[in-house]
């Protein structure tokens, strides 16, 4: 990690804070502010972390915002991430060579594969410069949000292996410190680590070995969140990107971790013990609720004498995970295209927090082609977690040019082109009535369809008209120049939103899309309105299609809507 910090410094991407800063909220708050600066943001190195409540000073500095912008991401990759995506695309399209030059190029490609698999070192070869810590309390573990249940490791590389040791997995899971030598393992039900857990448990075993690494090459933690197919070790991707194998050293529990890790925590998950984990302010921008999760017993902690503790803060976008997700989006496009050949491009808007909204451009060749691809998306790996997807044709503007793209989509909007489905969803999703399972919606905006022309009113007149039927606070129309403006409505909910929508259908000649939100939202901030809407809706419950009009209930839910979980 020290080597990468030097690289950040040389590229003017590092800000060093010498003053003592508290691990309880303060470090995370400063990192949050810095991350909001976008491409102007820098990584932050806190040289003197402290805990005021415990009257404690830590010896290990804290690095935040490692992936502060696209330049930092490329520095971690050692090259442009777009170059990696192009290389994957060419690899997938390899064909039998005919000319001598093509044969040589093919041979050189094959030779480069020898550096992909990790290299295992002899036992403890790299541990000579490590010291043994007595407990987790010696690490500057952060509390990032006021209502978090405690301190969490937020950039831990969690290494596991299956029962017969034929598969290895690297995942990035938050880890709540529940005692001085105990962590709570937030394994989501769909993740490989959780699958290994059930292998051990079904075999009647009591323990499952787990090791956690922190720091080292920053590409390790990026690889940990890469959506690779089940059974593929994430560090193979490291070898492909860097063209050099990861060097792994064994822990005493049999798990291998990178030799240059700054901190290594090894132990085991007790297969019979669970404790309440959370709440935690997560990347969705909401607190995830307290739930039972497995307990990891820490047996040994190693740390370099000059170790750097790497951490991150997640919450309302945009934050550091935006940059990490950008690399993922670009690099996995060629792989996704193998399952969806007519996919031209896709984009995960940051305010859609990855799994809540995806935009896709396709080469639409026949009726219902977009619907066919919707089903493909919802059945491919981690794409299956996506709640909402909008598809446009190959002539659409760039998927990142929202000012041009959104009117283009609205000119092609038709309620008959909306597909409502259901399936698995991210365990962090709070809107669905059931954990891990809920509604999905796809919109086919590939073809311009003739629809009746609306009589568009000014916002004030439309609000006055609507108030004759429903008690509203305010409204704002977006993209009034398009065929289907979006009308966002603020209200203090007095009845089910569907009832309010039904009443407003009397004025349907003035609108095609109504979105209902709670009073605390700001109509001037369209970025956060999108974030709120895609977070707060379950498509099967909250989307109403009547008389060729669309209603969306993005308000908080409760018993009236059949929602029995705790709304965050």
Identify the meaning behind each predicted range.
Residues 1-280, 284-295, 299-568:
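Extended, highly charged
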């Amino acid at each position: 990690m020290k080597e990468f910090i030097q690289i950040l410094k040389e590229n003017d991407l590092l800000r060093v804070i010498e003053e003592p800063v508290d691990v309880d909220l303060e470090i995370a708050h400063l990192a949050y502010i810095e991350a909001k600066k976008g491409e102007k943001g820098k990584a932050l190195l806190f040289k003197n972390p402290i805990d005021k409540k415990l009257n404690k000073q830590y010896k290990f500095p804290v690095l935040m915002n490692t992936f502060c912008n696209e330049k930092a991401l490329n520095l971690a990759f050692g090259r442009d991430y777009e170059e990696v995506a192009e290389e994957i695309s060419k690899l997938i399209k390899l064909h039998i060579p005919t000319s001598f030059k093509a044969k040589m190029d093919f041979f050189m490609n094959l030779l480069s594969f020898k550096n992909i698999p990790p290299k295992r070192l002899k036992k403890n070869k790299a541990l000579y410069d490590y010291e043994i810590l007595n407990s987790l309390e010696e690490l500057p573990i952060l509390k990032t949000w006021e209502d978090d249940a405690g301190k969490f490791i937020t950039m831990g590389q969690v290494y596991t292996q299956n029962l017969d040791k034929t598969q290895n997995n690297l995942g990035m899971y938050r880890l709540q410190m529940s005692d001085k030598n105990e962590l709570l393992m937030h394994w989501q039900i769909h993740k490989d680590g959780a699958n290994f857990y059930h292998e051990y448990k079904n075999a009647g075993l009591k323990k499952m070995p787990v090791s956690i690494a922190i720091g080292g090459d920053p590409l390790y933690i990026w690889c940990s969140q890469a959506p690779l197919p089940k059974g593929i070790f994430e560090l193979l991707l490291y070898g492909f990107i860097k063209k050099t194998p990861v060097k792994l050293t064994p822990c005493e529990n049999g798990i291998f971790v990178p030799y240059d890790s700054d901190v290594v925590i090894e132990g085991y998950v007790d297969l019979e013990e669970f404790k309440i984990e959370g709440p935690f302010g997560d990347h969705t921008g909401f607190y995830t609720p307290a739930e039972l999760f497995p307990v990891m017993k820490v047996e040994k902690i190693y740390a370099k004498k000059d170790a750097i503790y790497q951490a991150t803060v997640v919450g309302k976008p945009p934050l550091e995970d935006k940059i990490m997700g950008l690399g993922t989006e670009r690099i996995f496009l060629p792989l996704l295209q193998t399952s969806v050949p007519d996919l031209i491009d896709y984009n995960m808007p940051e305010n859609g927090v990855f799994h809540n909204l995806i935009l896709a451009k396709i080469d639409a060749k026949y009726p219902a082609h977009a619907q066919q691809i919707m089903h493909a998306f919802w059945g491919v790996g981690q794409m299956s977690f996506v709640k909402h997807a909008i598809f446009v044709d190959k002539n659409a503007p760039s998927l990142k040019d929202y000012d041009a793209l959104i009117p283009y989509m609205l000119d092609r909007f038709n309620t008959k082109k909306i597909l409502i489905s259901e399936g698995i969803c991210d365990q962090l999703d709070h809107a669905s009535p059931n954990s891990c399972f809920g509604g999905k919606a796809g919109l086919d905006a590939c073809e311009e369809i003739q629809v009746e022309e609306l009589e568009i009113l000014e916002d004030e007149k439309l609000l006055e008209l609507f108030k004759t039927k429903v008690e509203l606070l305010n409204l704002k129309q977006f993209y009034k120049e398009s065929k289907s403006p979006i009308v966002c409505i603020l209200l203090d909910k007095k009845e089910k939103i569907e009832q309010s929508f039904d009443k407003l259908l009397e004025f349907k000649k003035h609108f095609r899309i109504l979105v209902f939100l709670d009073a605390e939202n700001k109509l001037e901030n369209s970025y956060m309105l999108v974030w709120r809407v895609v977070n707060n809706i379950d498509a099967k419950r909250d989307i109403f299609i009547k008389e060729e009009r669309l209603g969306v209930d993005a308000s908080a839910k409760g018993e009236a809507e059949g929602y029995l979980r705790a709304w965050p």
